[in-house]
């Protein structure tokens, strides 16, 4: 028996599809990458990771059989202390309590990403979570690299 299920994941197409789409009401400029799944448009999550979770929880997540892809990026410096790691664990527990199960995280510094873009020969082992899959950062097309860099770099001061 075949069945169609709803999904918001645009795993490999959010960058090329964005090149064909005009501006959107969320502030995304024409020809820029679309958001990945239910993730905020790059740079628009200005109120922190807890606010993102509370927004995503308002979606009918239980009706999306294929899951709701949520990408978030955190600063490595915000994960160094036992207290900050405890806050990150609390954020994960909150996500589960809210019914959000398909979370993906990059713990990457913007400075490192910019340096990898400028000097790819030095970063062959830099792996990133793209949208449903991992890839070597330097192997991605420049627009995909920019989209990952444009994701807000969060702390865990929830």
Identify the function of each model-found stretch.
Residues 1-158:
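Acidic, glycine-enriched catalytic cores built around paired aspartates
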